[in-house]
């Protein structure tokens, strides 16, 4: 009896289970209802996940449509980051939730952007690194190896995408302290700290999404806005550091 009580006491409570689970199925209904929910989850998410993992195909947002701010985005990001951290171990220096879904009260495409920091970007090209991220559900996206800087230069990175059809996510792998790494963090912090900047970005995204329904075209169209915002971000950064 004591052994049984110890096992029960060691079990995760409901809050811990919710924090760790991508999906929760309510078993308060009938066994038939639960079986139906399990079958639906299997067919709509688990089977497509496995097939995409085998083929190396990432999930992508169907459109550029903006979703209302979702208070669960940070928790979803935390689960994904924990999975990545477990897969990569000490090869990772830092893990960050970035992009619009990391900014409270900001409408966004329902796509979680994550930043994985490494000591040197060459580490991200190692076969084991790529394979371990893929095994965790994040496959390498070929042909995406940099961001464009305002001055015409490029900021190296690697991109991985989630294969989960129920959670589109982009994983940006950058060297910690590189210009691209710092810009992503500073941009997030600027929008969190400055409601006017956040709302201006929201308005710009809504206007661009109305003109560019394709996600790729929408992302390309945002480049000009980012170039225009770069000076304002640098001004904010300088004021914060002074």
Label for each model-derived stretch:
Residues 39, 126-137:
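Short amphipathic alpha-helices in soluble, non-transmembrane regions
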Residues 137-177:
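Conserved catalytic core of two-metal-ion nucleotidyltransferases
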């Amino acid at each position: 009896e004591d052994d049984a009580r110890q096992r029960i006491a060691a079990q995760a409570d409901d809050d811990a289970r919710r924090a760790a689970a991508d999906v929760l199925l309510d078993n308060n209904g009938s066994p038939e209802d639960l079986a139906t929910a399990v079958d639906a989850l299997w067919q709509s998410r688990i089977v497509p996940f496995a097939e995409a993992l085998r083929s190396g195909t990432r999930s992508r947002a169907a459109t550029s449509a903006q979703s209302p701010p979702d208070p669960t985005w940070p928790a979803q990001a935390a689960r994904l980051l924990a999975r990545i951290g477990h897969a990569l171990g000490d090869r990772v220096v830092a893990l960050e939730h970035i992009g619009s879904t990391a900014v409270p009260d900001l409408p966004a495409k329902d796509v979680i952007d994550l930043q994985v920091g490494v000591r040197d970007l060459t580490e991200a090209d190692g076969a084991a690194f790529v394979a371990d991220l893929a095994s965790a559900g994040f496959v390498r996206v070929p042909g995406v190896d940099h961001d464009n800087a305002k001055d015409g230069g490029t900021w190296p990175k690697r991109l991985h995408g989630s294969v989960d059809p129920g959670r589109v996510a982009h994983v940006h792998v950058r060297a910690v302290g590189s210009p691209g790494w710092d810009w992503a963090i500073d941009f997030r912090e600027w929008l969190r700290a400055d409601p006017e900047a956040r709302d201006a970005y929201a308005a710009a995204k809504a206007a661009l999404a109305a003109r560019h329904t394709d996600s790729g075209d929408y992302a390309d169209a945002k480049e000009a806005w980012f170039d225009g915002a770069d000076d304002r971000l640098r001004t904010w950064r300088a004021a914060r550091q002074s």
